[in-house]
Amino acid sequence: MKEEKKLLLREVEEKITASQGFILLRYLGFTAAHSRSFRNNLSGVSAEFEVLKKKIFFKALETSGVEMDPEGGEGHLGVVFAYGDPVSAAKQVLDFNKQHNDSLVFLAGRIDNASLSGREVEAVAKLPSMKELRQQVVGLIAAPMSQVAGIMNSVLSGVISCVDQKAEKTQE
């Protein structure tokens, strides 16, 4: 193997081990402007997009000890390395894809040491984020509490109203 390829292989291995997960993509009709915009979007969620030869990527997976079946064929592959939350990166890919006429196709991914198919990665991207889930839980907890507070308020105002009416009767 040439020195350049060995260096690239080591670099990809480091990215695989440093990342929390990755998403494999096929990119269709992807212009330089799309690529730049996509990379900028991903940087906001601590992720990066690389175009790699399949052979090099799957060799790096093998030497990193990550088991994953290669998607058939030769050529290039788009890889999103997620250094933060891999689900947020998948959501960014999905959002970008919606805005750019489905120019990206999910092939596979790895999130939390689990290998996923393209459909599974897309399904994960459609799930609510942790922030959204927390908001829903707080809403579920807060709703009954506000109802209890409303009931207590109406009971207390009812008692006060009774006392006021009794006081008015005795004054007459």
Curated annotation (Swiss-Prot):
Keywords: Ribonucleoprotein, Ribosomal protein, RNA-binding, rRNA-binding. It comes from the Bacteria. The keyword Oxidoreductase does not apply. One of its GO terms (biological process) is translation. One of its GO terms (cellular component) is cytosolic large ribosomal subunit. InterPro entries: Ribosomal_uL10, Ribosomal_uL10-like_sf, Ribosomal_uL10_bac, Ribosomal_uL10_bac_type, Ribosomal_uL10_CS_bac. PROSITE patterns: RIBOSOMAL_L10 (PS01109). One of its GO terms (molecular function) is large ribosomal subunit rRNA binding. Part of the ribosomal stalk of the 50S ribosomal subunit. The N-terminus interacts with L11 and the large rRNA to form the base of the stalk. The C-terminus forms an elongated spine to which L12 dimers bind in a sequential fashion forming a multimeric L10(L12)X complex. Forms part of the ribosomal stalk, playing a central role in the interaction of the ribosome with GTP-bound translation factors. Belongs to the universal ribosomal protein uL10 family. This is Large ribosomal subunit protein uL10. The lineage of its organism: Bacteria, Pseudomonadati, Chlamydiota, Chlamydiia, Chlamydiales. The gene is rplJ.
